[in-house]
Amino acid sequence: MTPEGGHPPILTDNGFARLREEAAIEPDLPVESEVTKHTQIIAIYGKGGIGKSFTLSNLSYMMAQQGKRVLLIGCDPKSDTTSLLFGGKACPTIIETSTKKKLAGEELTIGDVCFKRDGVFAMELGGPEVGRGCGGRGIIHGFEQLEKLGFHDWDFDYVLLDFLGDVVCGGFGLPIARDMCQKVIVVGSNDLQSLYVANNVCSAVQYFNKLGGNVGVAGLVVNKDDGSGEAQAFAESVG
């Protein structure tokens, strides 16, 4: 399935150039067995409305244009991460589609929930309807479905996960808590609320590192920069 729509805009500022350089750094490979290919999984967090989906759409598009195999996964109940890539059209979510398939007595396949546009593979985990369930539990269920579909065997260079960062919930913190990603990128701005969320994410990474986790914070992407330098000062203070 390839929905119609225009190309997403491309950001060319120095901040994105630095971000691409960070993302290109290969993590330490496991030594248990010979590795022929290693997928780098990057989770992106930030407060609602800060521009995570916009940032990821452009980042994934540019990576694909450089010849990388990229999978973009929306991990927000709003299910709007991939809409920019598909011209404003919403992709069927994993949770919704798996429920329909189960009721029909059919098996869920990767072709039901994974779509491609401009070289980027994309999917949405989805979530429950408002007032009808737990968004964090929906994320956990979505990843359980990905496991059944062989998520870790897919041949991608990068997997980008778009997470909501406003809530303190185990489901939304899954990549950090379970070492599902190698790096975390925080999208923020110079306002106090976005930096508060950024600090919470950094604190979560630090907490799980003390418990033996290996996830690191790659950096802070400053969106809607008003020139005050608050986000830059925060990034320097947390290292």
Language model: regions and residue ranges:
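Charged, alpha-helix-enriched surfaces in structured cytosolic catalytic cores
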Residues: 54, 76, 80, 134-137, ...
